[in-house]
Amino acid sequence: MQRLGLGVFFVLVAASLSGCDSKPKTNPFEKKTDTVQPPPITEPPKPKGPPELTVSAEGPKVGWTYILLDKPDGKQKLAQAIGENAEYVSGKDVPLRADRNAKLAHVGEMISALAQGGAASVVVSTETRPEFPKTVKFASLASAKSAPACSVVAKVLTERRNAVWALKGGTAVKSPKGLAGPDMAMTQDSLEAAAHRCKDSDTVFVSADEDVEWGLVYDLAAATQKLEKAKLGRVVLIEPAPVAGRPVKLD
């Protein structure tokens, strides 16, 4: 019995040793691949080149970021976003696309922020009438503070009529209302007459009442660039708007 027990013991030991030496069977058709480590998580790459600047009904947008100007820190965030793109703004004619249904105040804030960021001018593009230019270059208000007192001022009124008068104040000549807004032909006649009375200035200041959409303001600015008998080479946006006929303070 003792010999039999020893024999069984040696058989079990041998079996266990042979089991340790044997390798697991592999599938001959299985492809061996190295383990690939996932790439480290990093911040998404920032887009190269100047950001697209737009103003829509939702408000100003710098690149992919909407700026909520109605928030207490809205103006600060707009200035910060423009400051982060200073290389594309400072000393440049900066392109800006503004939708017709954008708020005048929002477009005004964007133009003002770009001017404070060092832009030489802001070239605004807006859909308009076929006879008007598709872009208008706006100079900063600061660059026009020394404009002669006789300089031309034009404004779109709440009742969708245009008013034209001089920077120093005086009678505002109002155009009749057309089918799709102010009568632009009559407006251009008033602009030419006002420009002839001020030969020392080629500046025109444009604005509108608060409830007027940007598209009509753009039409007015564009009309100043298509005069046949006068030339108004510098366009400046005033916002908020002055009262028609009153002296305009360029603060």
Give names to the regions the model predicted.
Residues M1-F9:
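Bacterial N-terminal signal peptides that target proteins for export
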Residues F9-V11, S201-D202:
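Intrinsically disordered, low-complexity proline-rich regions
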Residues A15-G19:
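C-terminal motif of bacterial Sec signal peptides marking the signal peptidase cleavage site
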Residues D21-D251:
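Long, low-hydrophobicity, acidic/polar, solvent-exposed interaction domains
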